[in-house]
């Protein structure tokens, strides 16, 4: 199960949250979801030229406006000089959506362990005719040095411009895909090369989450079990004592 399913969707509601954080039970919910998709594609295409390194885009909606949180490795490229870029982007999105748009930019502290940024970096190198093996190995080394506990990268397509398509992957560390508390970041990126499209998949294991919470729950359960056993033992002792104290009937 864990080997086949998308690791992000597999962990939604457990250790991962949705990137569209709003609720609507009206019939226009499909239009709003489509609008979110358009916003993400527009922002990524708009900032791709600036090499801002967009790791994630989170959209929140209220009755009055739309709030967009952009997680970027280079927030200065998103904001621009004196905030010109972010103001222009906000105005363009307001024209597209027909509502007021507010944009917040959050800096990504460690871009070397963000799966989306790793995939985009490899795709950029492949499109500029860098060896796929060199790009993959370099990304793995950088991620492990930055603190990742495990990483796996798979490239599929006409690697090196050969006639027959194939897939190759490199891995270092561990990737526990079946463990739901394991924080596994996943991304899928396509590189458009002269030989054709090359698919890039990246898995990054950043460690376990909810460990303290799980330990606390287990300790609480153990305490309850011990208390229950103690009560049962005390009841057993009381019943034995009552039987011993019961006077014998004499004829």
Curated annotation (Swiss-Prot):
InterPro entries: KH_dom, KH_dom-like_a/b, KH_dom_type_2, KH_sf_prok-type, Ribosomal_S3_C_sf, Ribosomal_uS3_bac-typ, Ribosomal_uS3_C, Ribosomal_uS3_CS
Composition-biased stretches (Basic and acidic residues): 222-239
Compositionally skewed regions (Basic residues) per UniProt: 240-251
Record bears the keyword RNA-binding: yes
Annotated keywords: Ribonucleoprotein, Ribosomal protein, RNA-binding, rRNA-binding
GO biological process terms on file: translation
Sequence segments annotated as region (Disordered): 222-251
Recorded GO MF terms: mRNA binding; rRNA binding; structural constituent of ribosome
Function of the protein: Binds the lower part of the 30S subunit head. Binds mRNA in the 70S ribosome, positioning it for translation.
Quaternary structure and interacting proteins, as annotated: Part of the 30S ribosomal subunit. Forms a tight complex with proteins S10 and S14.
Record protein name field: Small ribosomal subunit protein uS3
Name of the gene encoding the protein in the UniProt record: rpsC
């Amino acid at each position: 199960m864990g080997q086949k399913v998308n690791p992000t969707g597999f962990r939604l509601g457990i250790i991962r949250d949705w990137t569209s954080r709003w609720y609507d039970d009206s019939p226009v919910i499909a239009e709003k979801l489509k609008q979110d998709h358009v916003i993400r594609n527009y922002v990524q295409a708009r900032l791709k030229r600036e090499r801002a390194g967009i790791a994630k885009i989170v959209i929140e909606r209220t009755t009055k406006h739309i709030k967009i949180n952009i997680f970027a490795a280079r927030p200065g490229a998103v904001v621009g000089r004196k905030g010109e870029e972010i103001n222009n982007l906000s105005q363009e999105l307001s024209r597209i959506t027909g509502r007021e748009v507010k944009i917040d930019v959050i800096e990504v502290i460690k871009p070397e362990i963000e799966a989306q940024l790793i995939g985009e970096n490899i795709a950029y190198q492949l499109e500029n005719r860098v060896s796929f093996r060199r790009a993959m190995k370099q990304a793995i080394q950088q991620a492990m040095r930055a603190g990742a506990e495990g990483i796996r990268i798979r490239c599929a397509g006409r690697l090196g411009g050969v006639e027959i398509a194939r897939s190759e992957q490199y891995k270092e560390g561990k990737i526990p895909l079946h463990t739901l508390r394991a924080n596994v970041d996943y991304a899928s990126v396509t590189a458009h090369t002269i030989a054709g499209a090359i698919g890039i998949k990246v898995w990054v294991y950043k460690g376990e989450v909810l460990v303290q919470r799980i330990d606390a729950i287990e300790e609480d359960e153990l305490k309850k079990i011990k208390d229950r056993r103690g009560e049962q033992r005390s009841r057993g002792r009381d019943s034995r004592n009552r039987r011993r104290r019961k006077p014998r009937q004499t004829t």
